[in-house]
Each structure stands twice: as structure tokens, then as C-alpha cells.
Amino acid sequence: MRVLGIDPGSRHLGWGLLVRQGTRIEHVAHGVIDIDTSGTFAARLVEIDDELGKVIASHAPDAAAVESLFFAKDAQSAAKLGHARGVVLLRLARAGVPISEYPPALVKRTIVGRGAAEKAQVAQVMTAVLRLAAPPRPDAADALAIAMTHLSAAGFAAALAASGAPVPRRARPRRARLG
């Protein structure tokens, strides 16, 4: 199973693709879509749609795992994030990719062992578990962690045990409702 993890944002959108083969989870690719902030917000949303479409076309995921909304202190930032997430969900749905959503605290608890973990801790664990040559950018590390959380039910505990990292509780996906 090829899972595309997505950490949505209106300035930077992280993505990471993992594949499960039997009990093994392997890194395929990851990256960050840096959105041009010089234009209108609507132009940013178009760029998210276009660039994510290229990632989906290049990697043909079987499923997607997207970070769910969380409460932000700034209402305007929360609204912009909500719009960006909407574009992500629409692009995935139009591509026929099944979508699951995970709250940030669950992802952090699954990957690091506690829901209030720092981004650097998530990147450190993902670098070790996936045997990456260098730590990914924070948005990409989060996206890889979201994909790993999705794959956790059938193999993540074994991958963590092999890496020497603490074994977290299993996570259950929450299917996105589109309509």
C-alpha cells in the first residue's frame, strides 16, 4: 500500500510517500511545496491544487492521510488553513484517493510517544525509523509522520521496535466525510 501523508498549509505544504510491503514500511519520497505568497490568496489555493496534482500523478498513492484541523489562536490563520485543507481534500477526492484524517496530537503520540512533542522530535524519529540520510524539513517530516500513523495498525510497532524507539499505542484512522 502506497500512502501519501499531507501536512496542509497555505504557505508550505509538506508531503511524504511511504509504502508498506508485508510488515516493512519504506520511504519512497517526500517534499515541501513552497507556495508563492506574493500573489492573492486565491492564487495560492490554485498553486496548492496544481502542485499537489503533480505529486499525486507522479506517485499514484493508494490512500492519503491528512492532518486534521486543530484550534488556532488566530482566526484568520485558521480560516486560511481550512481553505488550504479544502483544496487538498478536493484534489485527493477528484483523483479517487481514499482519505483518512488524523489530529496532530495523535500523530505526535504515535510517532514520539507523547502528543505535545516538538517538530524536531518528530523529524528525529522519522529520520531514524526511515533511515533517511538527513532530517527532512519540518513540514515534510510531519507529512511522513502522518503517513506512518496511517500505516501504524499493521507494522509500525515492528519498525519502531527494530529501530530501538519506544513503541506507541496503535492509531485508528478517521475517514474524511466529503458530502
Swiss-Prot record:
Binds 2 Mg(2+) ion per subunit. Its EC number is 3.1.21.10. CDD domains: RuvC. SUPFAM superfamilies: Ribonuclease H-like. Mg(2+) 1 binds at residues 7, 139. GO terms for molecular function: crossover junction DNA endonuclease activity; DNA binding; magnesium ion binding. Gene3D superfamilies: Ribonuclease H-like superfamily/Ribonuclease H. One of its GO terms (cellular component) is Holliday junction resolvase complex. Keywords: Cytoplasm, DNA damage, DNA recombination, DNA repair, DNA-binding, Endonuclease, Hydrolase, Magnesium, Metal-binding, Nuclease. It catalyses: Endonucleolytic cleavage at a junction such as a reciprocal single-stranded crossover between two homologous DNA duplexes (Holliday junction). Mg(2+) 2 binds at residue 67. Its main location: cytoplasm. The active site is at 7, 67, 139. GO terms for biological process: DNA recombination; DNA repair. Signal peptide: none annotated. HAMAP family: RuvC. Homodimer which binds Holliday junction (HJ) DNA. The HJ becomes 2-fold symmetrical on binding to RuvC with unstacked arms; it has a different conformation from HJ DNA in complex with RuvA. In the full resolvosome a probable DNA-RuvA(4)-RuvB(12)-RuvC(2) complex forms which resolves the HJ. This is Crossover junction endodeoxyribonuclease RuvC.
